[in-house]
């Protein structure tokens, strides 16, 4: 091996021909190709270069750098480093092999041409860019390709992985990602998206390290950061995010975490203890440097508003039906009309606050409404002379108490609450299956957790019956928010399972081993379902699973199941009970299938357990809305009917059972969702025991 710094006595030093004008040094990539036909296994030929000739002082020297060799059959160009004696275009370019960039080994000498992507301003002398290894190793020739790279670490870019990537992959990156300040993406999640893209387009993926170099060559200036809590941190690409219209937003394996990380860091709320009132003066000096928690939450709320339905139209309230009810002496029809106006304004203000995701103001809004002091000497609220421009006012607390003691007024207010809270649910969670950020989900759950306490505190001093009625409705609202956010969380977790081909195949294999005849035999005594219906559902489930259906397709299938099973009860007073019976039977059958999978130690038990939880919860959601549609009520009203077990009237249940008992005498044919066998045996002692 020869040392390139040996001076004129070194036989491995390159002789340079004087150029017309000196060219400033600039980092550059030069691609040359050896067209020799040296077979593999033959020792590489070493080029013996002549001794150095005197070089004019105005010629800039060529600095040693790294030369790497790649087999000629591979279109791979590795990275290295060089300081070249010519300029180049600093804009990022995609380099590919070109016939115009060849180095041919000929007896008469050698000719070197610059790659086709180099600018035309390169000097025309024949020794441009020819360098040797840092250690002075002679240039190795043979069949293959050489790539001479830029000389500074900060200017290294991956040409190899860009040239090796298909145009479809590069276009996919540009279509789905964009650079942005203050945002980040988990490195593992981005690579998982790439693997899915390769699987869909039948491409051979590169490894994670090579993909990282490809990302950096397409999106310049990316940095890597380790983000997350201690013990649960992940590497992130900082400065890149998914485009808002990218379909990958619905295909996240970790949607909640990614959605949170894609928020600009300056919008993240930093929850700090609230300052005391006596320290407000001291904290005013820092108000310009640090945003308050309220400001941070408002900024985050603006980001989250794209996930809610801010265009929801608030329905009209019904008029109170006083009938022949006698009002108290302290309550007049004038007061009832005033209550209608102010309560409508109060509910509209509540909807506006929730649409702006300013949950912390709900408590203040309730306190101001239910604890208003008298504004006049007689304690009576003023009404405008004309209804065209109603005056916004509040009723004093004692007047509200007197009005709420009237049963028709209390029931009217309960109906208004059902309409209000249903509108809030449809605003916050317009689609239970749509991915939403975990920060928004957690904010909704915290809001639901605080509702009952806020209302009880605001209504302190009101009669207990009034408080129970109001809290009963708000409890149904809070429970609905918790169920829907849990359903949304399950949907995002199951989405990754349903998109995994290997997991789906394993689930189908394990499901085919389940003895459904035994399941039907054990469940028939309890559920009394038609065997043909069970077999049809089993077949449809397997077909849908085999087709690797998406979550939306599964949701459509579940909706069709509910329609098919409950259609015979449409328009019947027994529809709500038939729907509840269907939920019980669906849950019982799915439990039997999970039991069989558990006993067989099925490899896909975890996937089935997750899918079962999701489908049970979504079936509950569908039945809830079907019952509400059949009864003409809101889903909040349907769920609020039995939300308080302590005040649940067993008399109503007994009356319902008695009414169903009369109908069972006329209909004892054992319909799929009719009375359970045990109840028919109780009403008909001569009924034979089946399934024992």
From Swiss-Prot:
GO MF terms listed in the record are: DNA-binding transcription activator activity, RNA polymerase II-specific; DNA-binding transcription factor activity; DNA-binding transcription factor activity, RNA polymerase II-specific; RNA polymerase II cis-regulatory region sequence-specific DNA binding; RNA polymerase II transcription regulatory region sequence-specific DNA binding; sequence-specific double-stranded DNA binding
Q: Where is this region: Disordered?
A: 1-26, 261-296, 660-692
Q: List the expressing tissues.
A: Expressed at highest level in testis. Expressed at lower level in thymus. Also expressed in stomach, kidney, liver, brain and heart. Weakly expressed in spleen and lung. Within testis, most abundantly present in spermatocytes: present from pachytene spermatocytes to early spermatids (at protein level). Also present in non-germinal tissues.
Which GO biological process annotations does it have? acrosome assembly; cellular response to leukemia inhibitory factor; cilium assembly; positive regulation of transcription by RNA polymerase II; regulation of transcription by RNA polymerase II; spermatid development
Q: Has UniProt tagged this entry with the keyword Phosphoprotein?
A: yes
The stretch of residues making up the signal peptide is none
Key words of the record: Cilium biogenesis/degradation, Cytoplasm, Differentiation, DNA-binding, Nucleus, Phosphoprotein, Spermatogenesis, Transcription, Transcription regulation
The UniProt entry lists the main location of this chain as: nucleus
Compositional bias segments (type: Polar residues): 285-294
Q: Does the keyword Nucleus apply?
A: yes
Q: What residue spans carry the Basic and acidic residues bias annotation?
A: 660-685
Phosphoserine (modified residue): where?
26, 386
The UniProt annotation gives the DNA-binding region as: 169-244
Query: Which Gene Ontology CC terms are recorded?
Result: cytoplasm; nucleus
**Similarity comment:** Belongs to the RFX family.
Q: What is the stated purpose of this protein?
A: Transcription factor that acts as a key regulator of spermatogenesis. Acts by regulating expression of genes required for the haploid phase during spermiogenesis, such as genes required for cilium assembly and function. Recognizes and binds the X-box, a regulatory motif with DNA sequence 5'-GTNRCC(0-3N)RGYAAC-3' present on promoters. Probably activates transcription of the testis-specific histone gene H1-6.
What quaternary arrangement does the UniProt entry report?
Homodimer; probably only forms homodimers in testis. Heterodimer; heterodimerizes with RFX1 and RFX3.
Can you name this protein?
DNA-binding protein RFX2
Task: Name its species.
Answer: Rattus norvegicus (Rat)
**Where is the organism placed in the taxonomic lineage, from the top?**
Eukaryota, Metazoa, Chordata, Craniata, Vertebrata
């Amino acid at each position: 091996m020869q040392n390139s710094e040996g001076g004129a006595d070194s036989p491995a030093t390159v002789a340079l021909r004087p150029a017309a004008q000196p060219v400033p040094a600039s980092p550059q990539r030069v691609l040359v190709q050896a067209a020799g036909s040296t077979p593999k296994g033959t020792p590489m030929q070493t080029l013996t270069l002549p001794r150095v000739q005197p070089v004019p002082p105005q010629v800039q020297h060529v600095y040693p750098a790294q030369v790497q060799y790649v087999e000629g059959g591979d279109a791979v160009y590795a990275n290295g480093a060089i300081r070249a004696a010519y300029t180049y275009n600093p804009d990022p370019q995609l380099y590919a092999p070109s016939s115009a960039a060849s180095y041919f080994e000929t007896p008469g000498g050698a000719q070197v041409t610059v790659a086709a992507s180099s600018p035309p301003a390169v000097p025309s002398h024949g020794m441009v860019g020819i360098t040797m290894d840092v250690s002075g190793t002679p240039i190795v020739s043979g069949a293959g390709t050489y790539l001479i790279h830029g000389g500074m670490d900060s200017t290294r870019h991956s040409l190899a992985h860009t040239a090796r990537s298909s145009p479809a992959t590069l276009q996919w990156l540009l279509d789905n990602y964009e650079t942005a300040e203050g945002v980040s993406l988990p490195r593992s999640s981005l690579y998982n998206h790439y693997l899915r893209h390769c699987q869909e387009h039948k491409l051979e993926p590169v490894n994670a390290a090579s993909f990282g170099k490809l990302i950096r060559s397409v999106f310049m200036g990316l940095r890597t950061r380790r983000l997350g809590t201690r013990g649960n941190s992940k590497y992130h690409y900082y400065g890149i995010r998914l485009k808002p219209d990218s379909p990958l937003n619905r295909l996240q394996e970790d949607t909640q975490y990614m959605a949170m990380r894609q928020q600009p860091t300056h919008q993240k709320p930093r929850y700090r203890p609230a300052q005391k009132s006596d320290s407000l003066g001291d904290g005013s000096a820092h108000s310009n440097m640090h945003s308050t928690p309220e400001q941070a939450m408002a900024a985050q709320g603006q980001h989250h508003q794209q996930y809610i339905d801010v265009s929801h139209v608030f329905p009209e309230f019904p008029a109170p039906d006083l009938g022949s009810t006698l009002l108290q002496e302290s309550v007049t029809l004038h007061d009832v009309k005033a209550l209608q106006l102010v309560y409508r304004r109060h509910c509209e203000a509540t909807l506006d606050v929730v649409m702006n995701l300013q949950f912390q103001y709900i408590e203040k809004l309730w306190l101001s409404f239910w604890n208003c002091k008298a504004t006049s000497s007689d304690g009576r609220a003023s009404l405008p002379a004309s209804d065209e421009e109603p005056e916004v006012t509040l009723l004093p607390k004692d007047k509200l108490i007197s009005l709420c003691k009237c049963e028709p007024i209390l029931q009217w207010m309960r109906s208004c609450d059902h309409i209000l809270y249903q509108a809030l649910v449809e605003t916050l969670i317009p689609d239970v299956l749509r991915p939403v950020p975990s920060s928004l989900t957690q904010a909704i759950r915290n809001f639901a957790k605080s509702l009952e306490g806020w209302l009880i505190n605001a209504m302190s001093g009101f009669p207990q019956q009034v408080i129970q009625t109001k809290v009963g409705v708000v409890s149904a609202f809070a429970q609905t928010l918790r169920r829907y956010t849990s359903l949304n969380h399950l949907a995002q977790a199951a989405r990754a399972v349903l998109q995994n081909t290997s997991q789906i195949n394993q689930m189908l294999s394990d499901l085919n081993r389940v003895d459904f005849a035994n399941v039907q035999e054990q469940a028939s005594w309890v559920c009394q379902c038609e065997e043909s219906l069970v077999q049809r559902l089993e077949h449809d489930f397997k077909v849908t699973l085999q087709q690797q259906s998406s979550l939306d397709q599964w949701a459509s299938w579940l909706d069709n199941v509910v329609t098919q099973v409950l259609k015979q009860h449409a328009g019947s007073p027994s529809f709500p009970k038939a729907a509840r019976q269907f939920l019980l039977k669906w849950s019982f059958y799915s439990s039997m299938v999970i039991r069989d999978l558990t006993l067989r130690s099925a490899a896909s038990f975890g996937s089935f357990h997750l899918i079962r939880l999701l489908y049970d919860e979504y079936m509950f959601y569908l039945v809830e809305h079907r019952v509400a549609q059949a009864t003409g009520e809101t889903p909040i009203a349907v769920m609020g009917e039995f939300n308080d077990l302590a005040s649940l009237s067993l008399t109503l249940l007994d009356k319902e059972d008695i009414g169903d008992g009369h109908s069972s005498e006329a209909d004892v044919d054992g319909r799929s969702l009719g009375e359970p066998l045990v109840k028919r045996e109780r009403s008909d002692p001569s009924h034979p025991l089946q399934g024992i």
